[in-house]
Structure formats: structure tokens, C-alpha cells
Curated annotation (Swiss-Prot):
The keyword Nucleotide-binding is assigned to this record: no
GO CC, alphabetical: plasma membrane
Protein name: UPF0266 membrane protein YobD
Natural source organism: Salmonella newport (strain SL254)
Transmembrane parts of this sequence: 6-26, 45-65, 67-87
Pfam families: DUF986
UniProt similarity note: Belongs to the UPF0266 family.
Highest taxon, organism lineage: Bacteria
UniProt entry keywords in alphabetical sequence: Cell inner membrane, Cell membrane, Membrane, Transmembrane, Transmembrane helix
Localisation per UniProt entry: Cell inner membrane
Membrane topology: Multi-pass membrane protein
Lineage of the species this protein comes from: Bacteria, Pseudomonadati, Pseudomonadota, Gammaproteobacteria, Enterobacterales
Acetylation listed as a keyword: no
NCBIfam families given in the database record: PRK02913.1
Amino acid sequence: MTITDLVLILFIAALLAYALYDQFIMPRRNGPTLLSIALLRRGRVDSVIFVGLVAILIYNNVTSHGAQMTTWLLSALALMGFYIFWIRTPRIIFKQRGFFFANVWIEYNRIKEMNLSEDGVLVMQLEQRRLLIRVRNIDDLEKIYKILIENQ
């Protein structure tokens, strides 16, 4: 096993750990989930570049008769990238004392100001950071409003 294979295993393990945390552990942290809302995905250009580069590496490894283990590891990395970038849906998860946004826990008392833009983006101003929440379904903004009113 080469150092390349070890690095690939490390990246696959990191992506798998992130996917498991995002899918199974985060919704169970900090109490029961009151509301979980699907968000719009960010630009997919980065994901296309990542999966494309891994596909080029797979092609290069196959045509140069590289190690079969490396080809399988690259394929697993491409599948993990495909899952994380295209299948997994970003979510905002509301709990009793706060919410998870982009895998970061934010307590309700940190919200200083909230605005709704004309194009349906909820803007939350924290102490030093601004959150831009783009929901997939515009009707979910009313659900978010009700949760925030009930818990503040």
C-alpha cells in the first residue's frame, strides 16, 4: 500500500465521518428536533470540478495500469463526493434552544436582527456574522418564523 492509498483512505474516512455526522448524529444533538427545513444548494461548480478531477485520476490510473487498489479507492472517493455534493440535502435543524445551520450550532439569543429579502432569503444578523438562509420551499419561511417566535 502506497502513501497515495493511505491519503485516499484518510479522505474517504473523513468524508464518510462527515456524512454520518450530518445525517445521523447532528439531528440527535441538543434535544429533540422541532423543525427540519431543506435548503437550496450552493453553486455546484466546485463539486463538478472535484468529481471531474477524480474521474481524470481514475482514467489515468486505469490507462497506465496503476494499482487496482488505488482505482477502487479513487472510485470510492468519487462516490462519496457524488453523495455529499448531489444526493445529500443541506438542512437547517431547529431545536428548543437554537438551531444547526451549516453544521454549526447557533443559540437563539445570538440573533440580533432578522430580515427577509425580496427574493425569499432570510437574513439573520448575529454578533459578528450574517447568515443567508435560502429555503427550497418559500412556505417554509412561515414555519421558521413560528418556531423563532415560540422559542424566543
